[in-house]
Amino acid sequence: MDFKRLTAFFAIALVIMIGWEKMFPTPKPVPAPQQTAQQQAVTASAEAALAPATPITVTTDTVQAVIDEKSGDLRRLTLLKYKATGDENKPFILFGDGKEYTYVAQSELLDAQGNNILKGIGFSAPKKQYSLEGDKVEVRLSAPETRGLKIDKVYTFTKGSYLVNVRFDIANGSGQTANLSADYRIVRDHSEPEGQGYFTHSYVGPVVYTPEGNFQKVSFSDLDDDAKSGKSEAEYIRKTPTGWLGMIEHHFMSTWILQPKGGQSVCAAGDCRIDIKRRNDKLYSTSVSVPLAAIQNGAKSEASINLYAGPQTTSVIANIADNLQLAKDYGKVHWFASPLFWLLNQLHNIIGNWGWAIIVLTIIVKAVLYPLTNASYRSMAKMRAAAPKLQAIKEKYGDDRMAQQQAMMQLYTDEKINPLGGCLPMLLQIPVFIGLYWALFASVELRQAPWLGWITDLSRADPYYILPIIMAATMFAQTYLNPPPTDPMQAKMMKIMPLVFSVMFFFFPAGLVLYWVVNNLLTIAQQWHINRSIEKQRAQGEVVS
């Protein structure tokens, strides 16, 4: 395998890795025409829960939330510091229950039989508009007494934060002990957020982290299979004393935090039960049932949990709960992408600009890999210098493949050339390249981050395609520095590849293209220097080792 074939192989593998899930998604099973009575009840319950809302609006410096007064659901959440993907004049909407998509947070109290004791009761609030007063704003929703229980649901929003505390205040005047559990749920449809593309696709769907099962993704297609078969076979831990669970998408997430970092688990009274399922043809949910300590007659109690609904900012989410940063989708190379992003973040803290930090990171990675790349490029340079002799052998022996191969092997021996010498070092670099790709692609920190001039958002494509065109030019330059393929078909392919890559990179985030451009420029400089050095040695009659 020569360098050209390896480059083509790596390019194709990278494209397949990035685009496969988007280009060839797992088909969703067609819902069965008949539903059981239980399925119909679940569907009716879900649709009723998402009926038109009576809005209560809460505004802080980071979010604008809409709570349905009757159900107490968090029905809409706008992230005021982030722009919409498709319209920079509008803020980004994470939760919503409009015609476009459904994505809401719900919470209920259940009796010992699992029935919602607040069903059909409804809450009320003293006012419809809330805003920050100091560092916090509290929204108290009160329900009429039911089963001898007085229940309030309280939302607390904090300045500068995307954490929302959801608390039930319970006063038991029923004359008997109340055995309850709190059920916290995130419901959404399977629609893809704006910005998903063929080559820039990230996971969308339920996730759960537990000490027993670590981080697990539960795809919509797995839940469809469960719904179709009537079984619950999706792989995730269903009972845990701690952890977190929710939904993630590119750059953003919503998760119920069972145990805040350094705090007590909400599952202290007993293991929490996790349930992730398809609710009906349109909606999916991830929920956790938290058992509460028995509430004696005349006593008061509370059930409190934090909901994080916001950006996947590593420095923030890492301090909220153990391993919450795993929700940042680095694909299958999290172990490599995470330290690379850590280094990028440290550089940004020093430089103050993500674009320049990417450039410095690229230089550092190139320097670390220099021993590997130097060996590879020297091998390629020797192959390039021997190209005229290889071509002469090909012309001399024509179609006699055996004689041609023997002559070429003799030439390699005489010239001290290892035809595979450039392959292993390049193969060892592939994890680095893939890790860097995911570190840059998945990082919300680059969203809306400018570099210079026309690049005002490193997470979006170059609006004028300047970087992709420069990248294509650098790839063309590399083809002239590398040894020409002996196969005419390979030669044509290597000339076409820069054009194909440039078109593909038109749709890549500018931060990714910036990395490739800088990496290519450094590679050209290194290869040019090595080629010149070897040609000079040969001209002086020295043996090139």
Curated annotation (Swiss-Prot):
Q: Sorted alphabetically, which Gene3D superfamilies does this protein's record hold?
A: 2.70.98.90
Query: What protein family does this chain belong to?
Result: Belongs to the OXA1/ALB3/YidC family. Type 1 subfamily.
Spans through the membrane: 350-370, 424-444, 461-481, 498-518
A GO BP entry is: protein transport
- Subunit structure of this entry? Interacts with the Sec translocase complex via SecD. Specifically interacts with transmembrane segments of nascent integral membrane proteins during membrane integration.
- GO function term, MF aspect, one: membrane insertase activity
Task: Quote the gene name from the UniProt entry.
Answer: yidC
Give the classification, highest ranks. Answer: Bacteria, Pseudomonadati, Pseudomonadota, Betaproteobacteria, Neisseriales
> What job does the chain carry out?
Required for the insertion and/or proper folding and/or complex formation of integral membrane proteins into the membrane. Involved in integration of membrane proteins that insert both dependently and independently of the Sec translocase complex, as well as at least some lipoproteins. Aids folding of multispanning membrane proteins.
Note the topology in the membrane: Multi-pass membrane protein
Locations listed in the record: Cell inner membrane
* Listed InterPro entries: Membr_insert_YidC, Membr_insert_YidC_N, YidC/ALB3/OXA1/COX18, YidC/Oxa/ALB_C, YidC_ALB_C, YidC_periplasmic_sf
**Which protein, by its recorded name, is this?**
Membrane protein insertase YidC
**Chief location bin:** membrane
Give the source's domain of life in one word.
Answer: Bacteria
Q: Which cellular components does GO assign to this protein? A: plasma membrane
Write the record's keywords in alphabetical order, separated by commas: Cell inner membrane, Cell membrane, Chaperone, Membrane, Protein transport, Transmembrane, Transmembrane helix, Transport
